[in-house]
């Protein structure tokens, strides 16, 4: 499944262009602009499955760093600071990774 099966290419482009500069990534505005905030729990789970590159059931820090590349191969990697802030926001149980329930809560935040 491709991410464009769930989200529109136009919304993805708008979301990516809003965070092209280093240190400009904001997960709340990204999820809103990309259209994920308005998707069903099932659709959000499918996006989680795409982001969970190693299929471990979690999005780990290295996968988060490449988060934007899941939306477009030409997108930039997140900076270390952006990655750590994103992980801290999503990792509510403190295990160092984001599970599917944590991701759903993060999207709806």
UniProtKB/Swiss-Prot annotation:
GO CC aspect terms:
cytoplasm
- Residues in domain EF-hand? 39-74, 78-109
From the UniProt entry, list the residue stretches annotated as the region In silico-predicted IgE-binding epitope: 59-66, 76-81, 79-85
Read off the CDD domains from this record: EFh_parvalbumin_beta
Stored Pfam families: EF-hand_7
Keyword Phosphoprotein present in the record's keywords: the answer is no
Does this UniProt record's set of keywords contain Calcium?
A: yes
List GO molecular-function terms, semicolon-separated: calcium ion binding
Q: What is this protein called?
A: Parvalbumin beta
Q: Which organism is it from?
A: Crocodylus porosus
């Amino acid at each position: 499944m491709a991410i464009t099966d769930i989200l529109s290419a136009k919304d993805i482009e708008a979301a990516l262009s809003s965070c092209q500069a280093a240190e400009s990534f904001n997960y709340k505005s990204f999820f809103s602009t990309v259209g994920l905030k308005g998707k069903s729990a099932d659709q959000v789970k499918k996006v989680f499955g795409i982001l969970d590159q190693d299929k471990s059931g979690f999005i780990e820090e290295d996968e988060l760093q490449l988060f934007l590349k899941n939306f477009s191969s030409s997108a930039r990697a997140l900076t270390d600071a952006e990655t750590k802030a994103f992980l801290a926001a999503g990792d509510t149980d403190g295990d160092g990774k984001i599970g599917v329930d944590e991701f759903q809560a993060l999207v709806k935040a």
